[in-house]
């Protein structure tokens, strides 16, 4: 019998369109519908920038007048003035803008203006400017990207940025502040909009140029989280960003885009992608002020301002705990996207029970790009999804992408059903890291550009793909590859408790897996270890099981995007073992 190879090319995707042409759909279809709703900003927060709409023209929302709400018409007209203001200051198409701004109305205006003015945008969390350790990263970004424009929130960040700039060789820079700043050399964003109003530049010509944007122009540079290594710059082309929007039309659509809740900060790749995807469908981007915060999400749901939400597994667990003591109507939520970390069957089923009226799906994405998989299980119950043990699939190969599982031992495409390195090819994936860093992560073959993701994955005979974990997280125990996520999903199924598995050193086997559970109450750790071996085999024998409490931790440590920080868990485990 001939074994199928684990590679699928799903064929081309029509992508002959610019980013502005995509978001212009919302402007044309619903000019007076809300494009941006900021629950954490007052209704008059941008009155100094925005020309108020006629209240009879603008569609009203559940909390109209209580928070900032911009219509497509308001957003576009103001962004045009801002784009012209940039041009009046000598900022030409192809220039780079570094924005360090919180989620909110200013971010939305800057993003729309960058698309109109054809500027490359870089987003960084403004808190990093004020952090002595992270400010070094800002200096590196400035030196590596040489932006023509930098935008910060207020005087505090302006002073810090001046200090950082003083340590670089950058001298020519347009410095913009969202609020009034007395520091020399800084201009308020309001002044740029005023300059745009007074400038005779043909605004219609600017819009037409945006419609015909060069697909090879650099659209954005986002930086990887740097959880385990130095952050790498990911330069995404206009054509790649447009490809992502076209491919994700199954994810955010006319049905669920009315109020698409965006909690990730705009420095995370998921945020601008979701913003543009929502605008392309004529929906409203709903923003909150505290990142992936469960309370903020629930506030949005109570106000009926959340038809589309994004959850990480850690958030799903926190939300479930909250809803045990609080009753909230979740019927306004139409779609729940789960991702950010590996997703188990329990998490998917739990999300379905938390949001009984919603479609629950997984969407795979990376800072380097996305749109390589399509969730093909929307028409079936989450419990009937074809799981691999307790592991959820990421879907099947999406149109416009090719997926390959690579056998590193044999140096060939793996057979289906066998794990290997996940390699992806798509227009939506960057062609290289900034300045050619980690060049070995990319290769050219058969007329296609491939990206080595760093994930270990498996493809079934039906073409369904499962990501088993990160290559860097793989535990090599006595010469055998052990995937922590496989054990974590098994433990969560057996105990109902959130689990994290890390590697600890062993004098004979090199490494062995060690598990940390949210709680060990009503758990027989020895019996659980025996069950893990019985279900997964002797390669998965645990060196021990412990609870967060025993390690001196109260909660699972997560980063800004709610991904678990395993390095902190490992440090706590090693302290515990050394102290015994």
Curated annotation (Swiss-Prot):
Entry's induction text: The expression of the dibenzodioxocinones biosynthesis cluster is positively regulated by the transcription factor dibT.
Function: Acyl--CoA ligase; part of the gene cluster that mediates the biosynthesis of dibenzodioxocinones such as pestalotiollide B, a novel class of inhibitors against cholesterol ester transfer protein (CEPT). The biosynthesis initiates from condensation of acetate and malonate units catalyzed by the non-reducing PKS pks8/GME11356. Pks8/GME11356 lacks a thioesterase (TE) domain, which is important to the cyclizing of the third ring of atrochrysone carboxylic acid, and the esterase GME11355 might play the role of TE and catalyzes the cyclization reaction of the C ring.
Keywords (A to Z) from UniProt: ATP-binding, Ligase, Nucleotide-binding
Record bears the keyword ATP-binding: yes
The name this protein goes by in its record: Acyl--CoA ligase GME11374
EC number(s) from the headed UniProt entry: 6.2.1.-
Pfam families: AMP-binding
Membrane spanning residue stretches: none
Top-level enzyme category: ligase
A GO biological-process term: fatty acid metabolic process
Pathway per the UniProt entry: Secondary metabolite biosynthesis
Record lineage: Eukaryota, Fungi, Dikarya, Ascomycota, Pezizomycotina
Recorded family membership: Belongs to the ATP-dependent AMP-binding enzyme family.
GO molecular function: ATP binding; medium-chain fatty acid-CoA ligase activity
């Amino acid at each position: 019998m001939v074994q199928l190879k684990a590679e699928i090319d799903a064929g081309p995707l029509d992508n002959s369109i610019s980013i502005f042409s995509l978001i212009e759909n919302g402007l044309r279809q619903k000019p007076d519908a809300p494009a941006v709703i900021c629950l954490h900003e007052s209704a008059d927060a941008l009155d100094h920038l925005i020309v108020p709409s006629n209240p009879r023209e603008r569609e009203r929302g559940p909390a109209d007048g209580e928070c900032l709400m911009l219509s497509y018409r308001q957003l576009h007209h103001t962004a045009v003035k801002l784009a012209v203001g940039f041009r009046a200051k000598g900022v030409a198409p192809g220039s780079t803008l570094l924005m360090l701004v919180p989620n909110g109305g200013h971010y939305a205006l800057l993003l729309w203006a960058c698309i109109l003015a054809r500027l490359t945008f870089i987003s960084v969390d403004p808190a990093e400017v004020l952090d002595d350790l992270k400010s070094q990263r800002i200096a590196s970004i400035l030196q590596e990207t040489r932006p023509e424009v930098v935008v910060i929130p207020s005087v505090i960040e302006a002073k810090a940025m001046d200090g950082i700039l003083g340590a670089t060789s950058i001298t020519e820079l347009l410095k913009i502040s969202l609020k009034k700043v007395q520091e020399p050399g800084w201009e308020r964003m309001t002044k740029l909009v005023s300059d745009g109003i007074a400038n005779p530049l043909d605004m219609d010509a600017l819009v037409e140029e945006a419609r015909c944007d060069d697909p090879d122009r650099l659209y954005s540079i986002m930086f990887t989280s740097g959880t385990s290594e130095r952050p790498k710059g990911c330069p995404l082309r206009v054509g790649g960003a447009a490809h992502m929007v076209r491919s994700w039309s199954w994810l955010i659509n006319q049905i669920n885009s009315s109020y698409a809740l965006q909690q990730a900060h705009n420095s995370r790749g998921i945020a601008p992608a979701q913003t543009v995807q929502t605008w392309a469908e004529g929906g409203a981007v709903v923003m909150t002020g505290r990142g992936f915060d469960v309370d903020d999400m629930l506030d949005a749901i109570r106000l009926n301002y959340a038809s589309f939400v994004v959850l990480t597994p850690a958030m799903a667990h926190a939300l479930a705990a909250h809803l045990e003591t609080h009753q909230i109507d979740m019927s306004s939520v139409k779609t729940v996207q789960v991702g950010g970390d590996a997703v188990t069957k329990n998490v998917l089923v739990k999300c379905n029970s938390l949001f009984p009226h919603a479609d629950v799906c997984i969407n795979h994405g990376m800072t380097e790009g996305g749109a390589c998989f399509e969730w093909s299980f929307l028409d079936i119950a989450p419990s009937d999804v074809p799981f691999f043990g307790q592991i959820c699939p990421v879907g099947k190969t999406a149109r416009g992408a090719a997926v390959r599982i690579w056998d590193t031992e044999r140096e060939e495409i793996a057979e289906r059903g066998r794990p290997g390195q996940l390699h992806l090819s798509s227009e939506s994936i960057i062609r290289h890291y900034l300045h050619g860093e980690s060049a070995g992560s990319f290769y050219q073959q058969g007329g296609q550009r491939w990206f080595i993701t760093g994930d270990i994955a498996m493809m079934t005979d039906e073409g369904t793909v499962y990501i088993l974990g990160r290559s860097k997280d793989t535990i090599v125990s006595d010469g055998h590859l052990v995937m922590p996520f496989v054990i974590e999903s098994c433990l969560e199924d057996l105990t109902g408790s959130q689990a994290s598995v890390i590697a600890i050193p062993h004098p004979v086997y090199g490494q062995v897996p060690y598990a940390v559970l949210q709680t060990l109450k009503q758990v027989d750790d020895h019996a659980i270890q025996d069950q893990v071996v019985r279900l997964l085999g002797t390669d998965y024998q645990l060196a021990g099981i412990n609870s967060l409490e025993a390690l001196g931790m109260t909660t699972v440590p997560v980063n800004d995007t709610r991904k678990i920080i395993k390095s902190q868990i490992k440090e706590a485990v090693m302290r515990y073992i050394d102290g015994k």
